Amino acid sequence: MGITKTSVTFLFLLILAAFVSNYNVLASEIKPTGRIDDQCKQMCSATYGDGKCASDCRKAGFSSGRCLTSSPFGNKCCCTK
């Protein structure tokens, strides 16, 4: 009984820790600063997604990048400083 209770408690704490640690990641949003034309050049597609976008942005000297679909970005790869 003690092992089962300990296991359930550990599992509950593990799930709780995972939920809390993802909270800030899900709430964050990338907002480009400066001119959008300078930081949102490449169009995103099924073959050019967040991974390739972030890689290309880092190669261009930015810290990261992501495909943004909302207006005014229009499904473009936007880099962040």
Swiss-Prot record:
Pfam families: Defensin. It comes from the Eukaryota. Keywords: Antimicrobial, Disulfide bond, Fungicide, Plant defense, Secreted, Signal. GO terms for biological process: defense response to fungus; killing of cells of another organism. Belongs to the DEFL family. This is Defensin-like protein 43. The keyword Signal applies. Its main location: secreted. It is found in: Secreted. Disulfide bonds join 40-79, 44-67, 53-77, 57-78. Residues 1-27 form the signal peptide. The keyword tRNA processing does not apply. GO terms for cellular component: extracellular region.
